[in-house]
């Protein structure tokens, strides 16, 4: 692995500047801030990748309310890459160049079982309000449920208002909340009234991305990622941080 790191560093790290990594926080277990600094799946992975490129790394938190706005920071130089549990979609591929996917996951549904004991999944949402974060890939899924008259409406929260959305499940601000399974599993741990009632609503490939046309950095990150996949590092990080709500891409 050390030899691999040296090769990758020599070929992929032309810059001696820190690798600036954009991420939308809080989004545990992918990334979250603690009193001791940032932690999470993406945080640990990018620390490893930066080391293999012989570069320091710097976390640049994205402050916008719409997740899709994060990609503009690549073009304006705010950061060199994004590692933020980002699903690879055709629309996003027009805004950034994605490396090979590192994780496959899917949307899940959370409810307050004391308010809605009979809701066991998306099939039981008729007449109910679904909460989503603005720009999250759950938003078009929820919109489709409403369009098909399988739910009443969608309530859109700013991206950093996830805890408000979860509080609203109990207060009545919304009836269900949709988000990737590792994230919902993390948040319900300390909220005994909330339960993840359905997983696997979608199948989504997640990946790191760079600004359009930055093939040198994309190749360097891709090679480092492939080495970390082969030596068991990424599978170990998935098990450690993401649990059963995520898996290796096949």
Listing of model-derived features with the role each one plays in the protein:
Residues 14-85, 94, 231:
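Extracytoplasmic small-molecule ligand-binding "clamshell" domains
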Residues 33, 46-56, 138-158, 188-191, ...:
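Ligand-binding cleft/hinge of the Venus flytrap
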Residues 40-53, 113-116, 123, 128-137, ...:
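Extended ligand-binding regions for polar small-molecule ligands
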Residues 60-72, 117-118, 156-167, 202-204:
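Short helix-initiation/N-cap motifs at beta->coil->alpha
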């Amino acid at each position: 692995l050390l030899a691999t790191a040296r090769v990758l560093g020599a070929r992929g790290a032309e810059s001696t500047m820190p690798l600036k990594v954009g991420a939308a926080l809080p989004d545990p277990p992918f990334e979250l801030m603690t009193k001791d600094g940032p932690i999470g799946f993406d945080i640990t992975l990018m620390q490893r990748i930066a080391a293999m490129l012989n570069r320091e790394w710097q976390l640049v938190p994205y402050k916008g309310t719409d997740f899709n706005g994060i990609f503009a920071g690549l073009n304006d130089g705010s950061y060199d890459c994004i590692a933020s549990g980002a699903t690879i979609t055709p629309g996003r591929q027009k805004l950034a160049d994605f490396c090979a996917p590192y994780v496959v996951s899917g949307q899940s549904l959370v409810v307050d079982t004391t308010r809605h004991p009979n809701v066991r999944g998306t099939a039981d949402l008729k007449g109910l309000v679904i909460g989503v974060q603005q720009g999250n890939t759950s938003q078009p899924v929820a919109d489709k449920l409403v369009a098909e008259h399988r739910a009443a409406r969608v309530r859109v929260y700013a991206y950093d208002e996830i805890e408000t959305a979860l509080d609203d499940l109990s207060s009545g601000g919304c009836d269900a909340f949709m988000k990737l399974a590792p994230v919902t599993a993390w948040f319900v741990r300390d909220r005994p009234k909330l339960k993840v009632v359905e997983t696997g609503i979608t199948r989504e490939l997640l990946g790191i991305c760079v600004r359009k046309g930055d093939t040198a950095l994309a190749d360097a990150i891709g090679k480092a990622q492939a080495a970390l996949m082969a030596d068991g590092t990424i599978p170990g990080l998935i098990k450690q941080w993401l649990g059963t709500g995520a898996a290796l891409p096949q």
